Structures are given as C-alpha cells and as structure tokens.
Amino acid sequence: MNVLSLFDGMSCGQIALNRAGFKINKYYACEIDKWAIQVTQANYPNTQQLGDVTKVSALDLPSLDLVIGGSPCQGFSFAGKQLNFEDPRSKLFFEFVRLLKEARVKNPNVKFLLENVKMKKEYQDVISQYLGVEPIKVNSNLVSAQDRIRYYWTNISGFTLPKSKGLTLDDIVDLDVPDKYNITERFYEKVPGTLAFKKSRANLRGLERCSKTLL
C-alpha cells in the first residue's frame, strides 16, 4: 500500500495502519514541524518526508492507494473564533482536495480519510460538497475515558463503530501519585475565585464520568 499523509504530525496515521494490519510499501508524509518529524523518523525511519503540503504534487509520486489527513481545525472549532475558511489554516483543507484530485489521475479508485473537529453544519457541508461524502461522527468515549467528538469523511465502506467500553475517569486515574502533583490548599483558597475558574466550572467532571479532552 502506498500512502500519502497530509498534516502528518508524528505519524499517528502510520501507527493506526500498522495496528490494523495493513502492509505499507511507501509512506509519504507532509509535515513542517521539526519536532514532529523527528519523532516520526525515530519510530518510522523509512517515512519519506515531503515538507510543506502546498509545495507537493501527487503527480510526482507513484500511484497512491490511500490519502489521509486532518487539516488544521482552529478556524472551525467551537473553542476558537470560528473564522472558518477565512482562517488561512482552514484553507489548507483545499490542499487535501487538490492532492486527492491529483492522486486520482494515476489511481481513480484511491481511498481517502479526512478528520476534523465538530463544527457548524454550514462548514461541515462545504467539506462534504468538495469530498462527495457525508461525515461519520465518532466520539472517542466509545473506547476511552474522554468525550472527544470528531468527524471523518471517507470513501472507505464496510466498517462499523466499536461498541462502547463504558470507561470513566475512575478506570484510568492513578490516585497513588507523589504529593507534588496534588492540588494544594492554596489552590482552593485562590483559584476558585478567579474568573477563569468560574468560566471553566461547566467543564469540571467527576471520576464517575468521562473527561473532556485528555492531554
């Protein structure tokens, strides 16, 4: 399998493909963060780094079987200013569209998978229009102790969502940790009165529930 991964990061896509049992022949990665590239090459030294996605052409590559990527989400995310396609980072989605179109010149049946955040329906519809498919909504709370909704656009068929494992924070939090990691009395005296804390109270979760995004 020949794979082109856009916005590759530290190559989590390569990890997923390996765990799923796919045999990768060539893995081409578009990434500009030097630290992410360093991690990728340490784990997968055969990865061919192509650099800036805007300066790459799929026409210069061998026939591709799969194009994957998660274009920058800041312009779409409810946590940001929601500048949508006015945000230069969001416009990088169209590089995914361009490279997928180029990949189809050599392989009309090339598969693709695009990931992005939960967003307004109007932005979602634009992406769907360009890719020709509706997104699949996946919440990572099916297999982890966090609520993290993501959308996936793909022309790969024949798969189903996993059954929920019912995990909560209580299943993963280690309570036996050094004191230096515990919240201090000073925190309880000072922080709860701050505006930032008051605004974040809606995001507080007990151990009997899933967390927001885990770091």
Q: For the regions a protein language model found, what residue spans apply to each?
A:
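Core alpha/beta nucleotide-donor-binding catalytic domains of modification enzymes
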Residues: 2-109, 120-129, 135
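Conserved beta-strand signature within the Rossmann-like core of class I S-adenosyl-L-methionine
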Residues: 110-114
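S-adenosyl-L-methionine-dependent DNA methyltransferase catalytic core
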Residues: 1-26, 101-109, 125-215
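Short strand-turn motif at the edge of the Rossmann-like AdoMet-binding core
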Residues: 72, 115-118, 141
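Hydrophobic aliphatic residue packing
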Residues: 53, 117, 172-173
